[in-house]
A protein has these predicted regions:
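Redox cofactor-anchoring modules in respiratory/redox and cofactor-processing assemblies
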Residues: 1-161
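Iron-sulfur (Fe-S) cluster-binding segments and ferredoxin-like electron-carrier domains
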Residues: 81-104, 108-109, 114-118, 125-144, ...
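Glycine/serine-rich phosphate-binding loop and adjoining beta1-alpha1 elements at the start
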Residues: 177-181, 186-259, 325, 345-392, ...
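Beta1-alpha1 glycine-rich phosphate/pyrophosphate-binding loop at the start
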Residues: 179, 183, 188, 230-234, ...
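Glycine-rich dinucleotide-binding loop and its adjacent helix/turn
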Residues: 241-260, 322-327, 332-334, 364-427, ...
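Feature captures the FAD/FMN-dependent oxidoreductase FAD-binding
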Residues: 261, 266-270, 318-367, 470-482, ...
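FAD-site-proximal beta/loop scaffold in flavoenzymes
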Residues: 375-405, 492-565
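A conserved FAD-binding loop/helix module that cradles the flavin
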Residues: 561-592
Length: 669
């Protein structure tokens, strides 16, 4: 039957052996009872316990195979004797018992070695591997005794069991691109910055970019937080990329790029933003022909024309772009708008097409008398296009022609709105106000602590719990806004607090420009109507979120067009997965996932980080390093990069705070 036979996961003890079906206990955790498709899991074993789904489990073989995975890892690491030699002994003894050659003294030795590893290993992988093994030895003792007393091998499931393992970390699991964060931090700590960059580019080609403008969700899952404060993970990422650029090194790829295949297979990608570039990179590394079609005259998508120079210098981003375009298999065509008719042509001509275009239509604020054609009404995307095309590429004219000496009101609460208000300051606006429906904590959660406080320092006025009710004009231009105030009223059912309008609390703001930045929408006119593509309730393109195939055979989607407006790192993570699936689909016509990708999904559902965990064996109180920022009076009048990054000494000191929280997980199927 399906269900959990036995579990010690995260100190949850379930033992359903010998119980009637109706009395079986259930787990509160999303354990992988089903591996993939119709394939059920027999067991899951990892850093925080073991879960058994098959009553006929071979516990001895399960423990032995788990130890084998760790032994292979520890041989490659070798940074501490308890981890390396302990892992060797752990595996040798378990393998000996599984072969029917063990003794009870071996069991005693196993327990002793396990306790030594748990208390003296330098990193978490050595400390945690023994836990599920000890659980199996305690609760499946009869199987161990049978192998020893009868000197007979364990059952080995008659040879029909496969063991699939994955090494992860809480930060890696939380990263949408699943970057091997402990590895690149280790490269910084060891001052081998090329190793750091190599670890990043395994799953993240845009190292310059995501070392600067990533919202770093990984830091929310940093175990160091349970001790004092999270590692400055994002800022350490840029060290390797900057080192490569500053020293003019040859491109460092995660693997030697394969020559262009001559089998005629080719993939079209629509959009040269983070999603399109990422998919092209990983397909191009495999030698698969990729043609990118980009509507804009420049490469890079919204990061190029939407993210300001002071946050993401175009020279650095261009290095990430050049890394992709340097590949023999990748080409790009600019000023090429793909409409529905052209998409049909590409779909017929190419073996697969991936949609990777961004959400570039600004949504309205839904206020009375809102007219997008009124003077002073300026969509956030159009405004940022003008700013960045001028400052980065000298295309068009300065936005200061419009904004200098003016009062600007922006409605938003995310990264785009932050870019709007901070750019307005730099373009000479007299007064800049952001209206946001919720509170300060929420805007920080939507963006970053640094982004919000830097905007405040630069003179942006934030008015929280507010929204525009009506827009006034003189027939040609916006003149003022009527703004309502709201208060948060707790939900009596314990849900999210609701915003309730404060009667009589409205007020007026005189302004010259209203720039809505509440969200963006997709231009879905690219999709042929007769394809009847399935869409989400947010009017993005529906996929299953795993292989990124749309309802149209051979058409994939990743990034904004699949999910709606998303962060760069999310787009990278989706596009890397899509590229992996496409690389197999164009040859066998099937959408399949690798075991590593299946395990990624299982671990992400399970959640690797445990915010309730109490950390022992580490000294708290090591302060988080803060990078130097350009002084406010200097930065708010120009577009120089604000975040100057760490010095070498600061970076090494911060990297030394990393606890190297690797874990091994394994599924038996």
């Amino acid at each position: 039957m399906s269900g959990i036979v036995f579990s010690t996961w995260r100190d949850e003890f379930i033992d359903n052996r010998g119980k009637p079906d109706l009395e079986w206990g259930k787990s509160e955790f999303k354990l992988p009872e089903t591996y993939y498709g119709d394939t059920n899991s027999k067991a899951f074993i990892g850093w925080d316990g073991v879960a058994i789904f098959d009553e006929d489990i071979d516990a001895v073989e399960l423990a032995s195979q788990y130890a084998a995975q760790y032994q292979e890892y520890s041989e490659a690491c070798g940074r501490c004797a308890p981890g390396r030699w302990g892992g060797r002994i752990l595996y040798d003894l378990l393998d000996k018992i599984a072969r029917g050659e063990g003794t009870h003294d071996d069991v005693a030795h196993l327990k002793e070695i396990s306790k030594t590893m748990m208390t003296t290993s330098k990193c978490e992988i050595g400390k945690t591997v023994p836990k599920p093994i000890l659980d199996l030895m305690e609760h499946y003792q009869e199987q161990f005794n049978t192998c020893i007393d009868a000197q007979m091998p364990s059952k080995h499931y008659n040879g029909d069991t496969s063991y699939i393992a994955k090494v992860t970390a809480p930060c890696t699991d939380m990263c949408p691109a699943h970057v091997d964060i402990p590895a690149y931090i280790e490269g910084v700590r060891d001052m081998v910055f090329t190793d750091s960059l190599a670890a990043t580019r395994q799953t993240m080609p845009l190292a310059h970019t995501c070392g600067r403008v990533c919202p770093h969700p990984c830091e929310d899952a940093c175990r160091r937080t349970n001790l004092d404060s999270p590692i400055s993970i994002m800022e350490l990422k840029r060290l390797g990329a900057d080192y490569e650029t500053d020293h003019e090194l040859p491109w460092l790829h995660p693997a030697e790029p394969k020559p262009l295949r001559n089998d005629g297979k080719k993939v079209a990608i629509i959009g040269a933003g983070p999603a399109g570039l990422t998919a092209a990179y990983y397909l191009g590394l495999e030698g698969i022909k990729v043609d990118i079609f980009e509507e804009l005259p420049v490469n890079g998508g919204e990061v190029a024309v939407g993210v300001p120079e002071y946050r993401m210098p175009i020279g650095k981003y261009q290095k990430d772009i050049d890394l992709v375009l340097e590949l023999e298999a990748v080409s790009i065509t600019n000023n090429h708008r793909v409409d529905a008719a052209r998409l049909k042509e590409l779909h017929a001509e190419y073996d697969a097409v991936m949609l990777g275009f961004g959400a570039r239509l600004s949504k309205k604020v839904r206020a009375a008398n809102e007219n997008v054609n009124m003077g002073g009404y300026w969509g956030a995307i159009d405004m940022l296009d003008k700013v960045n095309l001028w400052h980065k590429y000298q295309i068009g004219s300065p936005a200061s022609n419009e904004l200098n000496g003016k009062t600007v009101v922006c409605v938003g609460g995310g990264f785009t709105s932050m870019d709007v208000v901070r750019c307005s300051i730099r373009e000479g606006a007299k007064k800049v106000i952001m209206l946001y429906r919720r509170d300060e904590k929420t805007i920080i959660r939507n963006t970053t602590y640094e982004e919000y406080h830097e905007a405040v320092e630069e003179g942006v006025e934030f008015i929280f719990h507010s929204a525009i009710e009506e827009i006034f004009d003189d027939g040609e231009n916006i003149t003022k806004l009527k703004v309502n105030r709201f208060e948060l009223v707790p939900d009596p059912n314990g849900g999210r607090a609701q915003l309730v309008k404060i009667e009589g609390g409205d007020f007026e703001i005189e302004c010259d420009y209203l720039i809505p930045a509440v969200s963006q929408a997709l231009d879905t006119q690219i999709i042929p109507e007769d394809w009847n593509i399935e869409m989400t309730s947010w009017n993005s393109i529906l996929t299953n979120g795993k292989d990124f195939m749309t309802s149209k055979e051979g058409l994939f989607a990743a990034g904004d067009c699949e999910y709606g407006p998303m962060t760069i790192v999310n787009a990278v993570g989706q596009a890397r997965r899509a590229a992996s699936v496409i690389s197999r689909y164009i040859y066998d016509g099937k959408c399949t996932l690798l075991d590593d990708e299946i395990m990624e999904d299982h671990l992400n559902r399970l959640r690797v980080y445990d915010k309730k965990e109490k950390i022992t064996g580490w000294m708290p109180g090591l302060p988080r390093a803060e990078s130097e920022k350009l002084e406010v009076n200097e930065r708010k009048t120009n577009n120089k990069e604000v975040n100057l990054g760490f010095t070498g000494e600061e970076a090494i000191s911060e990297a030394e705070r990393c606890m190297r929280c690797y874990y091994i997980s394994m599924v038996a199927v």
